[in-house]
């Protein structure tokens, strides 16, 4: 039976998301921005915060691949942001509104 995860304006098949995250060694994936707040417009992208498992050796090709695969899965352009790369100025607000989509 297919289980769907609904977070704000984003709906995704849980099994597909879990498989994708496992393939890319994702520790946590969270939604933030307009989609998390329920304020998406037809032209909005989806902002996603990612944290990889500590032993992951993710390079730029893998990062771009994850972003593309998430875009395909969600049916929209995805803006993928590394949790470790968050600028101090926005870190608190992003983490406050982040809605967990996946955790390993």
Where are these regions (language model features)?
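Catalytic core of pol beta-like nucleotidyltransferases
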Residues: 1-28, 37-42, 53-104
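Short, aliphatic-rich beta-strand segments
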Residues: 46-51
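Catalytic DNA-binding helix-loop module of base-excision-repair DNA glycosylases/AP lyases
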Residues: 34
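Conserved histidines in hydrophobic membrane contexts and catalytic metal-binding motifs
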Residues: 31
């Amino acid at each position: 039976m297919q289980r769907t995860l609904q977070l704000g304006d984003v709906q995704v098949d849980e099994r597909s998301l879990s498989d994708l995250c496992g393939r890319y060694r994702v520790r946590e994936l969270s939604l933030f921005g307009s989609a998390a707040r329920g304020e998406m417009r037809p032209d909005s992208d989806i902002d996603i915060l990612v944290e990889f498992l500590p032993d992951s050796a993710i390079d730029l090709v893998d990062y771009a691949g994850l972003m593309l695969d998430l875009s395909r899965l969600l049916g929209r352009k995805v803006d993928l942001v590394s949790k470790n790369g968050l600028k101090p100025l926005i870190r608190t607000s992003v983490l406050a509104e982040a809605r967990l989509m996946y955790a390993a």
